[in-house]
Amino acid sequence: MFLTYVGESGITGATATDPSQPHQVYTGLFVHESQSISMNGEFNALCRRHFGAPLGEEGAPSEIRPVDVYQGLGYFASWPRLKRNELIQDCLGIMVRRETPVITSYINKQEFAAAKAAGDSPFVMMWDSPTGPVINKFFFALSMFLDELNMSTLSGDQIMDGGMPIANHALVVAQTGASMKSEFMPEFLRSDEGIDATGLIDDICFVDPEHSVVNQLSNLCAYFVRRWLQNPERDHPYFDGLRDNKVIQVIYPVTI
């Protein structure tokens, strides 16, 4: 079984047309249950090295928020850029060394708002906010990834027979207080796109990001994907490193 840790970015803007956050991004970091303990241990060792203590203890932040560590805000306001870069690289290195796969979905919130105002798109009119369609696309990307993973384990005879035993399935681990809600998954499974995903996605559970280091890593991925989407012509070494090292594997846009 895979634990799929959900990260998100671009949901704190003032409005759906906030120019500073034109995209809303969700990432799913796939961690096989056999790797979960080692990733947590490596992250805790990283925190001791950078902060002198695990997250949440005296002298350390409660969690690593991407915008804070990247821009030098909050706990990291006194940290020079080089020191912050080293922390980011060490965090991303946990995923790069394992080639931990990440699937991504995103929506252009400004395009959604314009289509909603025009009222001529039946697809857009189904949703009250951009969160619904982009999470629906996220679950679709998740099911497609698992489907391809299961197909890769089949022999030629099994494929010809038309049978596909489900060897790989996922438990979705989302963040308490974030935009992912429990009702989104059954809505997807009842849709035309999700009807074949029932056996692939076990359930969805919610954890406080302060208590889930892998959700924090997934948030970092979502943040750097969003920065790349906003200015794709600029250099984005963190995003490029994740993509070139087979961490960020698929990116699904919501087409409006």
Indicate residue ranges for each PLM-predicted region.
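Phosphate-ester processing/binding pockets and catalytic centers
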Residues: 1-256
